[in-house]
C-alpha cells in the first residue's frame, strides 16, 4: 500500500468532499528521492514511513529473504537496495522467522513493490511493517542501474529524502 497525500488541486472532482477523498479521487502518491554522495539522484514513490534517512547504500541480489535481510543486524545503518524485481509478494511472516526482533536497515529501495501478499503465513504487508517500524522505502524505476553505479564507483553514502534536508551518514564511523 503506497502512502498518499491529498491533492486539493486535483481537476477530476471536488476534493473538499470527504467521500471523494476516501474513494481515492483526490490522492496522489508521495514522491521521494535517493540522493547519493556523488550527486546522482534516483526518484521514486514512497511505500514506507515518510521521513528522511541516511546511510551507506548497499544491495542484495537475492530472490527471497527480504524480511530476514531487513532484520539482519549486519545491515544496521545501511540503505538496502533489493535488486530482485518483485518485492513484497509474500508479505511478512511471523516474528519467529526474523533474524532479530526489529528492522535494522535505515531505508529500503526496490524496483517493484507488491502490496498484496499471497502467502498463507503472511501476517502483514511489507509497507505496513515499514511504516510501523518508521523505516522509509522507495520504489524506483531501475535498481539495476543503481547497483551498477555502486559497483562501478565503489562504496557510496546516500540518503532518502522527501522535502527536508539531512546530512549524509556513514555507519562505518560509529
What residue ranges belong to the model's regions?
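RNA-binding accessory domains that recognize and position tRNA/RNA substrates
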Residues: 3-7, 15-174
